[in-house]
Amino acid sequence: MIDHTHLRLFQFCDSQFPTGAFSHSFGLETYIQRNIIHDDHTFIAWLKMFLQEQLTYSDGLAMRLVYDALENDDTQKVLHIDKLMFVQNLPKETRVGAKQMGTRIVKLALELYNSPWIAWYHQQMQDKKAKLNPAICFTMLGHYLGVDIETIIDYYLYQNVSSLTQNAVRAIPLGQTAGQKIVTHMIPYIEETRKQIFELKEADFGMTAPGLELNQMAHENVNVRIFIS
């Protein structure tokens, strides 16, 4: 039997879903222009690093903490994590890009579902108390749909792997079949990343590799680009 609850959340993982992920490489384009990433093998190495760093210590850990806050109706905790997600994202393009994607996801989620938490989150943005982050909104949507946090994180990590791989297919470039092989190859690493997220302490939040952040910052000065970040 198909689990429609999970399918409703998985809809937001579609690389064609209009979240704006299509326009962001989150530093990948800088690595490509420097010829550090030039084929499927070098891209996989970068993607694993992105999973193990930014998506573990930032997005993934934030999702775990937000889910606990939702379970305890702790609005101040949610706002605190929203603020941390914004201020610890030092590269301007990725910081602004995450805010834009978060805004799109919140608006789309409100069009599709009547989630009190997402409606509250949107109101906090209008009151200038929140920035809106895609990882936080995705967690709120999964919580509203009754999906467990482990699955929510798995789906979010998969969405990032899928969208970044599609962007790599365009930018390196790679073939579509090569792209699908990469996604298949990364699935076990998604599970490993989620397990690592559940071993972290709250004090570990934001421990992103400086090399990744520096390349995200350097993207502001690339001569030719196809991505916003």
Swiss-Prot record:
Q: Which UniProt keywords apply?
A: Chaperone, Cytoplasm, Nickel insertion
The lineage's top-level taxon is Bacteria
Task: Provide a GO CC annotation, any one.
Answer: cytoplasm
In its keyword annotation, does this UniProt entry include Cytoplasm?
Answer: yes
Q: Listed GO molecular functions?
A: nickel cation binding
Q: Give the subcellular location.
A: Cytoplasm
Main subcellular localisation: cytoplasm
Chaperone among keywords: yes
> What cystine linkages occur within this chain?
none
Q: Which family does it belong to?
A: Belongs to the UreF family.
Q: What function does this protein fulfil?
A: Required for maturation of urease via the functional incorporation of the urease nickel metallocenter.
Q: Tell me how this protein assembles.
A: UreD, UreF and UreG form a complex that acts as a GTP-hydrolysis-dependent molecular chaperone, activating the urease apoprotein by helping to assemble the nickel containing metallocenter of UreC. The UreE protein probably delivers the nickel.
This protein's name: Urease accessory protein UreF
Source species of the chain: Staphylococcus aureus (strain bovine RF122 / ET3-1)
